[in-house]
Amino acid sequence: MNPRRKKRLTLAVALIAGVAAVASLLLYALNSNLNLFYTPYEITHGKNDTGVMPEVGQRIRVGGMVTIGSMKRDPDSLHVEFAVHDSAGGTVFVTYDDLLPDLFREGQGIVAQGVLVESGKLEATEVLAKHDENYMPPEVAEAMGQTHEKPTYNQKALEDK
């Protein structure tokens, strides 16, 4: 092989190796920032279609209703513990060490994002409460078996206001 071909081959191999390294680093970064959505039932029994269960230490989002009577507050700190359930009968216990949203209350729908510390227990870094009685995020509504419909507005009624 002459020196010119050898130089081209070395350059091509280096270029392919560089592209592969960048692609693998990109995939690793995207995978570590991925937050999968689960219902409480899916955390303990696995996804309905695939059977995949979240691993301990994995960052996930959990959506469901706050169980009435399950909220425990620490009087000396912001630490709160509560249970979240769904219509399939699953329950997950959530701990949170920050201010809860103003709309947060027992019996309301929430989405908690955090790390699964053990099976059935989530250490939340963020808790989101739904906006009003009628709104529910589409993924929570689908997971809980309810229909999520967009409100229809009458143009004449809007003009009369």
Swiss-Prot record:
Pfam families: CcmE
Statement: the UniProt record of this protein carries the keyword Transcription: no
HAMAP family hit by this protein: CcmE
Disulfide topology: none
Molecular function GO labels: heme binding; metal ion binding
Residue ranges with Basic and acidic residues bias: 147-161
InterPro entries: CcmE, CcmE-like_sf, NA-bd_OB-fold
Periplasmic side: 30-161
Cytoplasmic side of membrane: 1-8
Name of the protein in its database record: Cytochrome c-type biogenesis protein CcmE
Metal-binding is among the record's keywords: yes
Membrane-spanning intervals of the chain: 9-29
Role of this protein: Heme chaperone required for the biogenesis of c-type cytochromes. Transiently binds heme delivered by CcmC and transfers the heme to apo-cytochromes in a process facilitated by CcmF and CcmH.
Topology class, membrane: Single-pass type II membrane protein
